[in-house]
UniProtKB/Swiss-Prot annotation:
This is Tryptophan synthase alpha chain. The keyword Amino-acid biosynthesis applies. The keyword Lyase applies. It catalyses: (1S,2R)-1-C-(indol-3-yl)glycerol 3-phosphate + L-serine = D-glyceraldehyde 3-phosphate + L-tryptophan + H2O. The alpha subunit is responsible for the aldol cleavage of indoleglycerol phosphate to indole and glyceraldehyde 3-phosphate. GO terms for cellular component: cytosol.
Length: 268
């Protein structure tokens, strides 16, 4: 069975939502990044959302831009990232793993080659932040050819037509934006999202995970109470990495504590 579907069904049976942390692979370096991803899963993450380092991350605020710079400075390449992700996949065969990235990285490898490499590494889904549904045909075709879910963003300003496309084209989960703008924990997530969730359900969309500005357990609880299948937290996780760069043990402990507190807020 599909890993996302299996995870959402298991969580529903346990009356829980999903908590999904985001990190940039190879931040702050490949060796520690592997430990970070492992720590997130051990602490209770239901899935991982991973960034491949890129020199010009348009939709990201300063926190995730910093992660990209650290990773690139440590010598990160897409191949090193795929190798690390493959190691996490081997250790956690049932864990949904998604990429969140930019089209340039896909184009530079060739669209088909890129998705084939994702499939080889055991990646379940790819969200390309700068490709809207109406420009996505080539990406969706390649993703589906290699058994990778194409993920789409449902922004708060979306028309019914956009939400319909997101629902029909997407697989795995739907990335529901809690607000417009760039990523960052400084800007709190806006609730309510009930109307959006009702429309996505009406269009039979994949389960919605709420992202952007999720940094506290209370926000996770609100997202799930509103009807989302779970929440994604990126900048808040990366901030913990950023603030413990010289003390890896303290970093891993702080990450574990954060994930565990966010995960405990998913119980319905």
């Amino acid at each position: 069975m599909d890993r996302y579907q299996a995870t959402f069904e298991r969580l529903a049976a346990q009356k829980q939502g999903a908590f999904v942390p985001f990190v940039t692979v190879c931040d702050p370096n490949p060796e520690l990044s592997l430990k970070i991803m492992d720590t997130l899963v051990q602490a209770g993450a239901d899935a991982l959302e991973l960034g491949i380092p890129f020199s010009d991350p348009l939709a990201d605020g300063p926190t995730i831009q910093g992660a990209n710079i650290r990773a690139l400075d440590s010598g990160a390449t897409p191949d090193i990232c795929f190798d690390l992700i493959g190691q996490i996949r081997a250790k956690y065969p049932d864990l949904p793993i998604g990429l969140l990235m930019y089209a340039n990285l896909v184009y530079s490898r060739g669209i088909e080659n890129f998705y084939q490499r994702c499939a080889q590494a055991g990646i379940d889904s790819v969200l390309i932040a700068d490709v809207p549904t109406n420009e996505s045909a080539e990406f969706v075709a390649a993703a589906e050819k290699f058994g990778v879910h194409p993920i789409f963003i449902a922004p708060p300003t979306a028309s019914d037509e956009t939400l319909k496309q997101v629902s029909q084209l997407g697989g795995g989960y739907t990335y529901l934006l809690s607000r417009a703008g760039v990523t960052g924990a400084e800007t709190k997530a806006n609730m309510p999202v009930g109307d959006m969730l009702a429309k996505l359900e009406q269009f039979n969309a994949p389960p919605a995970l709420l992202g952007f500005g999720i940094s506290e357990p209370e926000q996770v609880k609100q997202a799930i109470d509103a009807g989302a299948a779970g929440a994604i937290s990126g900048s808040a996780v990366v901030k913990i990495i950023e603030s413990h760069l010289n003390e890896p043990d303290a970093m891993l402990t702080a990450l574990a504590n954060f994930v565990s507190s966010m995960k405990s807020a998913t119980q319905k």
